[in-house]
Structure formats: structure tokens, C-alpha cells
Amino acid sequence: FPLAFVLLAVLLANGELTFPWLKESGEHAHHHIPAWHNYTFLVVREVLGMIAVMVIHWIFIQRQAVSERSAEDAERFHNIACWVPYAYVLYGTMVAWDFEMTMLPSWHSAIYGMQHFISNFGMFLAFLVIWIYALNSRGKLVRPVEDYVYNYFAQMLFAFTLLWIYTFFAQYLTIWYGNLPSETVRVMAMQDGDYTFIWWSMLVLKFVVPFTLLSFPPVRHSVKATTAVATCIIIGTLFERYVWIGGVKGGVGTY
């Protein structure tokens, strides 16, 4: 969290370099800019949100350490654990809105927060698989992780692959069917513009490869195959984050 807070501070301090709409709002002050695009409000909510998440997770770790000491400690740990998913989803949604969706002030998607959360959580699972594999293969864990555990990881990766493509297609289909220029211009520009390679690579790495391979039990029971799929998911998610931010200017640009 300290590193995340420092990176957040750097992004917020960059102003127009991080949020291109700041320059446009200054040059065209007479144009309507949603209240959500108030820079002071943005900085305050992002900083307070990060602090709130840090505090909740700090309490979670402290109570987890003594959760087996007594029934009361177990209950206190359970209570704070119930708040962690809410904090993660709410703050994750705000990050999705501030750093991606609203980069183009006129563009909105009701499902974007959920799609962003599911995508990033899938990447977290993929990172966890690789991290455990790296530590386990080098004998760095106090208790080695058995190979059958990777099958459970593979099933979770498969589930979040399906959830991701569901939310992705739900958003894409709604925008395509509505056919409103203010909504379609951003998606079609990323799909057909200079970022088209990254766009289609994202779909291949985040859906085609995981869905195709993890559908077969031998792959799910293979440690190396599961780790390879996890690597594809991480790269695909990085492509996804890049194309949504970098492609905001009509899908035109170098990368």
C-alpha cells in the first residue's frame, strides 16, 4: 500500500499529463463539464479512498493474526473481513471511473466499474498463481503447495475468464446496439484504429487462450500449463488497461 500511495500521488500530481480533459476544460471553460470532473474533488476522493482501503486492510491483518486466540477475536476478525469486499469493489469502481472511463468526459458505461473489477481480480489470481509457483519451485515456502492446488486456481481462472467475457460483451453489445456516436466512437476507434493489434491481442490473451486451454482437465491439472495461461491473462490485462487509456484520443497514436 505505501508504494501504491506513492504511485497514486505521482499520477495525481501530473495533472494534465494524467487527465487530458483538464486542459480541454481550461481552454473551453464555457463547455459543460460534469461535476465529477472537478480536479480538487478527484484528488480528495482518490486520496481518502486509498487511505480508507489501507486502514481497513491494516485492521484486517491485525485481527487475522489473533483470530484463533478466542471466540471474541474470531468474531472481530469475521466482522472486518465482511467489509473488505465492499471496500475493494467501491474503491476499484472509483478508480475505473477516474482513470479510465471518464478520460473522455462524454463517454459513459453503466457496467464499466464491474467489468474493470472482474478483469483486475482475474489478473490478481493469475499473478497469485505465478507468485506461488515461483516461491514453491524454489523451496521458499514453509509448507510446500501441492500440485493439486493448481487445479483449484485453474478453475477460478476459468470462472473469471467467463465473467470477464460476459461483462465485456454485455458492454460491447449495449454500445453497438444503441449506436450512439458519443458511445460507439471510443470503442470502434480502439477496435479499428492504431491500437487494433493491442485490442485483438487482449481478446486472444484474456479469453481465447484461457477458455480454450482451461476447458480441458489435463491442462487444469498441469502446473506449468496453468502458469502459462496465467501469464497470458496478465499480459492481456495490461493490454486492456493500456488500450482503454492510450486509445482515448480517437484510437490514434503510437505505442
Put a short name on every predicted segment:
Residues 184-191, 246-255:
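Short, membrane-exposed interhelical loops at transmembrane-helix boundaries
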Residues 210, 239-250:
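Transmembrane alpha-helical segments of integral membrane proteins
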Residues 18-40:
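Interfacial loop/helix-cap signal at membrane boundaries in integral membrane proteins
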Residues 1-18:
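Membrane helical hairpin/interfacial module
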Residues 214, 219-220, 238, 245:
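Alpha-helical transmembrane segments of multi-pass membrane transporters
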Residues 203-211:
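Core segments of transmembrane alpha-helices
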Residues 34-202, 216-219:
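Long, contiguous internal "core" modules enriched in hydrophobic/ aromatic residues
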Residues 225-235:
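Central hydrophobic cores of alpha-helical transmembrane segments
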